[in-house]
Structures are given as structure tokens and as C-alpha cells.
Amino acid sequence: MKKTIRIFAFILAISMCMGIVACGNKPEETTGTSSASATTSESGETTGITSGTDGTTATTDATSSGTVDPPAPTPIYNKLLTEKHGEYLTVKYNPAYCELSVSTKEGIGDSYKATVTVKMKDGYKFKGFSFDSGIANGKEVASMKTEYTFDVEKECTLFVNCAMTYAYHLNGGAHVSGKDTVEYDADVTYYKNPNSLPERGYFKRDGYVLVEYNTKADGTGEGTSLGSRPYVGDRAKIDLYCIWAKEAPASDFEYEKTGKAVKITGYKGSEEGVLAIPAEIDGSSVISIGKRALAGTKAETIVLPASVMELCEEAFADSEMSTLVITDAIVEFTGETTGGWGMSAANTVIDGCENLANLRINAVLYPLYVTYIESNMKYDYMLWAKDRKKIVYVAGSSGQFGFVAEDMEKALDDEYVVVNYGTNANISGAFWMEYLSKLMGEDDILLWAPEDGQYLFGNNRLNNRLWRSIECNYDIFRYVDIRNYTNVFGSFESQQKDKAINSTIREYDRFNDAINNNGDLFNKRDAGPVKGGFTFNQFPSEECIAFMNTQFDKMAENGVKVYISFAPMSKSVLYDIAKKTQADLDEYSGNVAKNYHGTVISDIADHAIDSGYFADSEWHMTDAGAHLRTEILIRELKAQLEKEAK
């Protein structure tokens, strides 16, 4: 408990910083009242938790003097585009939010004047021009005027910063402004579905826990966990309603009190609906759920407040809940069970919870990996594309370094949105496929090109690599049943220990300038000495393969074409170091075709590419190599589509 109290002090310090930041972010507020529906009580309390969003529901060149209006974008374009104007000036903007014109006028020597004029589209807001990167990345505002004239004397990049509106309806809660509805500008310079507000004390309601935001006041719309991304679509404004759960009375609990900290040690109540743990008891913060404290409870849903930072072993063991709502303020798991493959106190917290399918996580701490190359950008584009005709390319890091989604979009005449879902080869492919099966439908294409290894082939054990990838959108868990996976809380524990040590202020709208909206990594990558090796046929258990095939079958039933290819491989490593033969390749590709329900569209030998196109590993290609390898995939994909069209 003393260790937990020290953690509590640490988190409290972070929370104070959060409060300062929250006060500094002055929202644009409106005077409105939330309109609760008939099924919501007068107090704004909801009696259930929604299942949420699980599916049930060009470059132009300017002359040295003149004005250039960019061509009208195709309907799929909702991305940050790059235009070159004159010798030095690059402008980045999103045509979904604004119209742009640029004129240049000759100056002295190589310099020239540029005038950039922006006209916002209905509902979107202009947040100013900035150089080198977006304001979200900490760059200063160069001008707030919609017509900006400046001297261009050297290479420079001008960003047009834009925002949409998130309107939060308090639904019985309170805000420092005293209003029922408050509006926040959400930066869309890069992201299309900005993160919602995390749990940093923006909205409060005495005796209640804020469970989620919802598109309907009664909680029956699309739900979004605090800090995650709601689906925005093409809207310039989205309405989100606070959904509250009434706290259980303190008399229902047994607890220990140490100073200003409370540890719950038992539960005496009989709640069968929503059991919301109080944030305070006797004026002290509830920071810990003790060993077996909530074991055997009958509640369908258990909700933890943001004050809870410690879970002890078997905290919820043998409970009947189907939904557990927690926060990422939990940074400590304690107990006697340690060591072994996935054996930790963290994994015991849900022992025997056979009905627990739904894990909801509200964000409290700042993200560590907001600009991580495996994460934020890809999932934003995937969410935006969920109702569009699309191709989703799934792989490990070979997808980051060896595939260019923009090339494929252009080659297919923009008929498809193409998402580069290359992440990491050590993340469960089963998790990705279950998630993606809820976001893909008729005429979509899944293009799966896994590196050889148990994880991408369907091993269902989760690890901290996954958590790094999803920490900016925990709502990916709304699309999966956690009973299908092992080491759920053990892997979460690993991530949270990292956060507890390294937590600092990193806002959600920061982005990586080296990754485009499609998820392509477009930095300059030169060829380098390539080492490594290849071990084929590393398949997981039959049960894991069967689960992968269940997801592929679901996609096929929904009209998705499931195509299988192979990751790019350094030819010299493959043949000279790993000593693989054509017979080895044939055996491996044959096993992939035999084990998985999909159509193999590639010859594996075609993806063994000259080592001069690889950068720092046998899987990671140079930027030129990524374009070359994408051309191979495009040819294979076109051939398959033409074959099916006959």
C-alpha cells in the first residue's frame, strides 16, 4: 500500500500538470442545453453501457510569377496534400477542409514573394499558418490572416492548420464555465478523427463516474472511451454526450484507509447492473482494489474511476461481468503470482471471468507513442475509411518499410482508399484480423503479406508492442472479444510500468512528419549492410490458425476479397546467409496457402529482391525499394482482379 501511495503522489503530480494544461486550453464555448432523450432519467444517469462502434451500428508547379489553383481532388481525398510553388516553397494542406490559391512574384536574385490565400469550407476553422510542421507539433503561428504574403529565400514548408468542432453535452454533469454544452476545437491538420478529451477533470458530476462519450444522450448511439477517437466521417462538427454511472454507496464496501488513500478489500452489495466504484470514500481517494475485493460479483458491468491506480491479484476473479471499464491511470499490479510465460499478478485480476468480453479503457495519462510509426496515423485513416471502398494492406514492419499505399491508390485510379496497416511482426495478427473484420465490407480487399512468425500468423498472446500501437485509441478493444486472447493484463502491466516512469506531456494531435495519412513511411532510407536470416513455417497452434480463418471467413461472407502475398525479403540474406532454396520457398508458400483461407496472388520468389534495395534489416527496404516492391504487388493485384472479372 505504501508503494501504491507513492505512485498516487506521482500520478497526482501529473494530474496537476494536466489541470494546468486543461485550463490553458481555452475552449470555445456555446450556451446550450443537452437534450436527453426519453429513456434517460432526469438526472442524466444511464442504466446501461453501449457496445459502441463495433460495427453494429497532387503536386503542381508554379511559374516564377503567377497564380496556381490546385485541381479539384478526387472524392477519396481527405489527406494532407503537398504542393510545390516556385523553387523553394512547399505548401501542405487538406482540400477536404479548405480551398487554396498561391501566387508568386519575382524578387531579388533567387528570392520571391508568395501570397497564400485560404478559404475554409463550411464549418471548418482556420487555425493559422505555420512553417516546418503543424501547430500541433509545437510550431509557432506564422500568421492568422487567411491571406498571407511573405518572402521566400530558401527551402521552406508552409502548413495550413485547420480544426473542427467537438461539442460536449454534459448530460447532468458540470463544467467550470457553468454551461451545459462546451465546444472544443479539435485539430484536423493531419488527423481526420481527432481524439476526444481524456479524463483530466474537464467534466464532473458528484456521485457519478464518467463512463464514456456517446453520440446520443441516452447512450444508445456510438460510444467513445475518453481520449479515444470517435468516427467523424465528413462532419465539421460532432456532438458527444457524457454518459454517467451512479457510484455505489460506500456502505457496500469493505476498505482500508491509510492517510488520504483508500484500498477496497471487499464488496457487500448486490448490484446486478452497473457497479461503479466510488472515487472517494470518507473524503479519501480510492486508489486500490485489493486481492479478491470484487471477486464473485454479479454485476453485468464494473466501472472503475480514474482515482484507481492499483489492482491486486484476483481483484475481479469469478465475477459475472461482461464489461469492465478501467483507466490507464492503473500503473501497479500486485500479488504473489510472478514469472513464467504470461504468469503475473496482472493476468489473475480476471481469473474465472468467463463472461468478460468487453474491455473499455478511458485515457488519463498522456500517450508515450503518439508519433510512433506503428500506431496513431494508420488507425485514424482506417477509421475514416471504414465506410469507403478500400484495400487494407496488413503486415509487420516490412509494411512500414516496403509498401507505398499512395502508389497503389494512383495505380488503381483512386477507385480504392488504400491503408498501409504495416505495424510490427511481433503483434498478434489474430487481434488485427478480428478488429478489421468489423471495419471491412462489400468490395473491400484485405491484402495480407505477413513476415514469417507466430505472431502475424495468429498467435493470440498480447504484448506491450500492441499497447504501444493502440494507446492513442484504446477503443480498438471495442471491436474485439478479449476472451480470444491471452496475457491481456500482463501486457497492459508492461506498458503501464513504462508509462509510470516516462509519462510527460505529449498531446494527442501531434503527428509524425515522415508518415503520410495512408500510413506510408516516406523518409529517405539509403541502402545499408543487411544482416539477419529467415526461418520458415513458424506457425502457431491449430486453434490459433482456426481463429484466424474464422476472421477471414467472416470477411469473405461480408463481401471482402481476402488475398495473400508475402513480405519482401533480401535476396542475399535469403539465399546466401539463410541458405534457402526454391524448394524451401515452395514448401513455405504451399503451407501458407494450405493453412489459411484466402487466395494467394503472389509468387514468393518475386518478393525476394536485390539486397541493394534494403536498408537496415532483411525485411526493411529503402524508399526506392518500397516503390519497386509496391509495383510488384500492383501487377499481382491487377492480374487477380482481371482474372476474377473474366
Annotate each language-model stretch with its function.
Residues 24-26:
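Bacterial signal peptide processing site
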Residues 390-473:
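Membrane-embedded segments
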Residues 459-560:
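Secreted/periplasmic serine-hydrolase-like ester/acetyl group-modifying domain
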Residues 7, 252-260, 270-287, 297-310, ...:
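Structural signature of tandem-repeat unit edges
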Residues 615-646:
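Histidine-centered active-site loop/cap adjacent to the catalytic His
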Residues 69, 360-412, 434:
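Membrane/wall-proximal cationic-aromatic binding patches
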Residues 19-22:
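C-terminal motif of bacterial Sec signal peptides marking the signal peptidase cleavage site
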Residues 66-247, 335:
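Secondary-structure capping and domain/repeat boundary segments
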